[in-house]
């Protein structure tokens, strides 16, 4: 694993521990106890904040986007740990898609039930 990705590996180790032990007073425990709905709410919130930050000008906007990307990745990893998904599994999925057009990959997926939204 590249050294730059080691913090993600360490974070995932911590999140797996939190998922197993659910220590009192932990923010991560609170999210995990709320399940997919609570974690998903935070992911949506952080995604919106990242989008807003990405539109901010100059280096300050770039730094804000980096900060918000960290929040989004953290919360996505909380969901992964809650669901028992490992970073290696996500990496393998991304490797599987490598070299495949996004449109081709999307077309190969099974059809989803209509969620009532356009362009899901």
Curated annotation (Swiss-Prot):
This is Phosphoribosyl-ATP pyrophosphatase. Pfam families: PRA-PH. Its main location: cytoplasm. It comes from the Bacteria. It is an enzyme of class 3 (hydrolase). Pathway: Amino-acid biosynthesis; L-histidine biosynthesis; L-histidine from 5-phospho-alpha-D-ribose 1-diphosphate: step 2/9. It is found in: Cytoplasm. Residues 97-120 are annotated as: Disordered. Belongs to the PRA-PH family. GO terms for cellular component: cytoplasm. The keyword Secreted does not apply. HAMAP family: HisE (MF_01020). Its EC number is 3.6.1.31. Gene3D superfamilies: MazG-like. Residues 106-120 have a biased composition (Basic and acidic residues). It catalyses: 1-(5-phospho-beta-D-ribosyl)-ATP + H2O = 1-(5-phospho-beta-D-ribosyl)-5'-AMP + diphosphate + H(+). GO terms for molecular function: ATP binding; phosphoribosyl-ATP diphosphatase activity. Keywords: Amino-acid biosynthesis, ATP-binding, Cytoplasm, Histidine biosynthesis, Hydrolase, Nucleotide-binding. One of its GO terms (biological process) is L-histidine biosynthetic process.
């Amino acid at each position: 694993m590249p050294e730059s990705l080691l913090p993600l590996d360490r974070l995932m180790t911590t999140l797996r521990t939190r998922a197993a032990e659910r220590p009192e007073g932990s923010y991560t425990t609170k999210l995990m106890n709320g399940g997919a709905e609570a974690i998903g709410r935070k992911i949506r919130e952080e995604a919106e904040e990242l989008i807003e930050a990405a539109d901010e000008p100059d280096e300050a906007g770039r730094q804000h986007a980096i900060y918000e990307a960290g929040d989004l990745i953290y919360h996505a990893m909380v969901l992964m740990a809650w669901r028992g998904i490992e970073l290696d599994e996500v990496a393998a999925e991304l490797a599987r898609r490598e070299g495949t057009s996004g449109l081709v990959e999307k077309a190969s997926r099974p059809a989803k039930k209509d969620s009532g939204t356009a362009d899901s």
